[in-house]
Structure formats: C-alpha cells, structure tokens
Amino acid sequence: MGTLSVNQNKLQKRLRRLAGEAVADFNMIEEGDKVMVCLSGGKDSYTMLDVLMHLQKVAPIKFDIVAVNMDQKQPGFPEHVLPAYLKELGIEYHIVEKDTYSVVKELIPEGKTTCSLCSRLRRGTLYTFADEIGATKMALGHHRDDIVETFFLNMFFNGSLKAMPPKLRADDGRNVVIRPLAYCHEKDIQAYSDLKQFPIIPCNLCGSQENLQRQVVKEMLQDWERKTPGRTESIFRALQNVQPSQLADRNLFDFTNLRIDETAASRFVNVVNI
C-alpha cells in the first residue's frame, strides 16, 4: 500500500484512536499480557490484528501478540491464505485444526440450526488452546455494530437485555475475552479492509435461523440510521448508561424494600402560607 490520502489517513487514525480508547477504558491489555488474537479471515479480525500490532508499538506497556486461526475443516476452506499472510507479517501464529464441521453435521439433523453447537465447540477449543499457550487475554473482532445488533437479538428473541461486553471473563474463570474494536464502526472497518486489501476468506454462512435473524436486525438498524443518522451510536451509548432502578429486574435493584425516606426534606411548597 502506498502513501495514504488525507481521508485514508483520517480513517486509519480514527480506528486506532477508538481501539486505543476502548482498550484503555476497559483495561483490556495490561503489562506483560499475552494476547491471543483470534483470526477468522474476515475484515474485522484482520483490522483488529492490524490495529493491535500498531498499539503494541506505541503503547506505554509491553505485551505479546499471538495470532490464532481455527480450521474447522469446512469444505472449501482455503487453508493456505492465513499462514501465507501471517508469515509475511512476521508474527507468531498457530493454526488450530479441529474438525467441528463433521461433529456438527453428525449431531444436528439437516435443516436444523447449527450455530449454537458450532459456536460452543469453537469457543471451547479456543479457550483450551489459549490456556495451553499461556494466553492471558483472547481478542475477538466484534465491533460496535455487532454489539448493538446482539443487544436487539437478545431483546427480540431471548427476552433479555444483554449484548457483547467489551471485556468478559469466561464461565471457566480461566479466560478473559476482549473486544478492542468495540468502539469502531463497521463501515470504517470495511473501508479500511478495502484500503489494506486484506486477503479476505469469504464467510461460509450456513443460512441458519440465527444468521437470518441477525441480518433482519442489521437491516433494521441500517434503515434507522438512514432515517435518523446517529441513532446506532446513541443506542451504543445507552448500553454504557444503564439505570437499574428505571427497569424491572428485581435481581439488579431491590424494589421489594423500596420505601419512602422519612428523613428526606419535602420538595413541595406550602402554597397556603405564601
């Protein structure tokens, strides 16, 4: 890639700045961390690796990066693409081979949703590998739009107010997941991916119900954004400004013992004595 234009330079700086802010705000990376960067071959994970490699050079702390791709043995997966790219970058990398594709095909009847099992198998394999190599953080490439979409998916289809946190300790307690692109917009990531000409591996969408639902939510948000620019950003800010007393979750707020404060001063004016 040659010299960047003014707009291209702004794009690169914006992504680096937003990722840096997210890392700092949530203390995602600390001195001496070994960050396992999970690569799928898509625009998001390539951009995340690029940004983290820059951050590694300029950050006031020292941390290591290890790139990891999981080859799930899906038919047609181009096994040579990522190793060639990572060798050219000159960074440490691992290709974890695990035939989860055959397991899913064997256990899930044709036409049924495979996402849940596929995701669990992939996550479990990556968690185990992170433990094996001594990784202290596991970086995923989810961005702001992914987080907002997940919020609506959970609300519409699961009846819960839940999204993707920028930083998460896994249920096993041994893995901490970070999402450095949490503040970054998908359109910026797409533009940067096009600019850098990353060797994209096409996503083999299975057409499952979960993917179809996510696409519906994505289109809904895009339509909102066209009609009211800035709405997605406002929704994302709302996820950082939660007020449990204004919701209805009894586990988050003690409504049962909520009573008047007898010591509180009256806020009403005695109009009779005016």
UniProtKB/Swiss-Prot annotation:
One of its GO terms (molecular function) is 4 iron, 4 sulfur cluster binding. It catalyses: cytidine(32) in tRNA + S-sulfanyl-L-cysteinyl-[cysteine desulfurase] + AH2 + ATP = 2-thiocytidine(32) in tRNA + L-cysteinyl-[cysteine desulfurase] + A + AMP + diphosphate + H(+). CDD domains: TtcA-like (cd24138). Pfam families: ATP_bind_3. It comes from the Bacteria. One of its GO terms (cellular component) is cytoplasm. Keywords: 4Fe-4S, ATP-binding, Cytoplasm, Iron, Iron-sulfur, Magnesium, Metal-binding, Nucleotide-binding, RNA-binding, Transferase, tRNA processing, tRNA-binding. It is found in: Cytoplasm. InterPro entries: Rossmann-like_a/b/a_fold, TilS/TtcA_N, tRNA_Cyd_32_2_STrfase, tRNA_thiolation_TtcA_Ctu1. Pathway: tRNA modification. Its EC number is 2.8.1.-. The thiolation reaction likely consists of two steps: a first activation step by ATP to form an adenylated intermediate of the target base of tRNA, and a second nucleophilic substitution step of the sulfur (S) atom supplied by the hydrosulfide attached to the Fe-S cluster. Catalyzes the ATP-dependent 2-thiolation of cytidine in position 32 of tRNA, to form 2-thiocytidine (s(2)C32). The sulfur atoms are provided by the cysteine/cysteine desulfurase (IscS) system. Belongs to the TtcA family. This is tRNA-cytidine(32) 2-sulfurtransferase.
